[in-house]
């Protein structure tokens, strides 16, 4: 708790001179360790380190100021390049590409500059569940190896106002 408060106050940035960048929760729900995702591609960090969120609602927001690199046409995932350089992948549910976009409504396009908190995707979580698919949403930093500091904050309910990843080069 004390460490988190010191991070928020910028203590470590002042002490060590490293800028700390924050990635906020893109979807409201319970933040869990990436290892809890029932898909080894995500759980074993093959695409990068991060967290996952068990969503409480079906709105995906920009987790920081960024540029949309790829908005998948099916709406099930989006990759962003954060202004700080982090390459972020948000994958809504597992195996949801097979739903062919039906439960998704996209609100951004490739190349769009987005601000933290801007709506990117809406998803009908009930439709995903009715299809028998998990709604757990991995949030990855694909270039996580580029960072010397990589902290995740899990085990609690989060909204777009909560930092879930902090990183520094």
Report the location of each language-model feature:
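Contiguous, well-folded functional domains in the mature portion of proteins
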Residues: 5-169
